[in-house]
Each structure stands twice: as structure tokens, then as C-alpha cells.
Amino acid sequence: MGAFPAGPAHQCTVDDLHGAKFVRDLYDKVGAPVGTRFTVPILWDKKTGRIVSNESAEIIRDLNACFNEFAENPTLDLYPEALRSEIDAVNEWIYHGINNGVYKCGFAVSQSAYDEAVTELFHALDKVEAILSTQRFVAGNVFTEADVRLFPTLVRGGGQ
């Protein structure tokens, strides 16, 4: 995974590992088939020069389970065995109601589709608010991947 420091080329940032200006450049580098969607995040293997994953849920689990030797806090477990069923349940409604919910609103093709999507989104946000009014984190009293998955959408929601 290369960092993308700010670069002058058309207000794009440039990957310092391969000089890629666009995410598409990385997909082209690995010979992605025509019609592939160029999505992020990307977990990149520098040794093999390939995309390991572009699925955020898998990347979170991989980083949690496979990279402890590089972690500042290697004992942090975002998916502890005792909370897995709760985390999975929370992840399910957070994804459908919030993470994907904002896209359902943004890509609605009719007013009724938008109304349905925004209602579902705000029901899920109300649920988060109710949970966080009684406990510190969404899947219990410890920080888990459910919090990691929720955070970016909450942060981005206020800036759009």
C-alpha cells in the first residue's frame, strides 16, 4: 500500500510507490479486466505487485488479524471472539442502513426512492444515537470493527 502525497498534476495526488495519479492506474497495472470498477480502499501487496483486496470489510479483518507485528498496539483486537455475533449483527444494519444508506439516498432515481432511503438512513442513525447514549461503542463497551466501519460515513456525512 503506497501513500498518496499531494502532487501538482491536475490537483491529483501521486502514489509514491508506482507514480500512479489515479486509482485506475493501479488497476491497469495489475491487468484488471475491462469493465472493472476502480474502487478504494485497496490493500496492495508491494512484493507481488497486486491488489490483495478492495473490500473494506475484508481489509479491516485482515489488518486486525494479520499485521500485528507492524501495529503500534498489537494486542488490540477489533473482532474479539466473545463479541463476534454482536459485531456481525451491528455491522449488518450499519452497512445497510448507514454505510450503503447514504449511497441509496444519493443515487435515488425518484422522490419515492429517496424518501424511502432517507427514512431508513435516519432510523439507523437514531438507532446509533440510542445505543451510544447508553454505552461507549456500538457493539458494547470496547472499541471494535463495528466502530471502525461506522466512523467514515459519519464523518463524511457532515461534509457533503
Positions of the model-derived regions?
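GST superfamily/GST-like fold recognition
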Residues: 138-160
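GST-like domain detector, emphasizing the conserved glutathione-binding G-site
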Residues: 1-138, 142
